A protein has these predicted regions:
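Short, Lys/Arg-rich, polar N-terminal cytosolic tail immediately upstream
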Residues: 1-15
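Membrane-water interface at the C-terminal end of transmembrane alpha helices
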Residues: 18-23, 123-143
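Internal alpha-helical transmembrane segments of multi-pass membrane proteins
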Residues: 18-19, 76-97
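Alpha-helical transmembrane segments of multi-pass membrane proteins
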Residues: 27-39
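Membrane-interface helix termini and inter-helical loops of multi-pass transporters
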Residues: 42-52, 108-109
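Short aromatic-rich membrane-water interface segments that cap or initiate transmembrane helices
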Residues: 50-62
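Canonical alpha-helical transmembrane segments
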Residues: 59, 63-80
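Membrane-helix boundary connector in multi-pass membrane proteins
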Residues: 102-116
């Protein structure tokens, strides 16, 4: 009996480990993209309502991890309560991606900074959108 009960625990641990790895990969990818931008002399300076702000590597890493954790929460809820979590996830995240990029181009900054910040959003999305959903039984019992 304990052997049967251990099966879901192992599977859940794999899902969690897979999602942690996904967030780590997204973080490394955005960090690398940020560094490539710096090598290309992008200054990452933006004017905000509270003053001029430099988008640092640390800020990029924290933002990516935060987006990954938020995405994990959303996909977990979708997997629990919807019959098509992957479809809803993809539609929702693409809308969020577009809505996150629009303000980048409305913020006063050099064009190379704006383009690189938009690229950073796309890099994180390129990893998180396809990789966070995991195959398992949904709320309706389907895979």
């Amino acid at each position: 009996m304990s052997h049967v009960a251990a099966q879901p625990v192992v599977r859940n641990a794999r899902w969690r480990a897979g999602r942690v790895v996904t967030i780590a990969i997204a973080t490394m990818a955005t960090g690398l993209a940020w560094l490539l931008g710096r090598l290309a002399h992008v200054d990452y300076i933006v004017d905000t309502p509270i003053g001029t702000r430099k988008i640092t590597l640390a800020l990029t890493i924290v933002a990516t991890v935060a987006a990954g954790i938020a995405g994990w929460l959303v996909i977990a809820l979708l997997e629990r309560y919807t019959s098509n979590p992957r479809g809803v996830w993809i539609a929702l995240t693409l809308v969020v991606l577009v809505l996150s990029i629009v303000p980048v181009f409305r913020t006063p900054a050099q064009l190379d900074t704006q383009l690189m910040l938009a690229a950073l959003h796309c890099v994180a999305a390129a990893v998180l959108i396809p990789a966070l959903p995991q195959r398992h039984t949904t709320a309706t019992g389907r895979r």
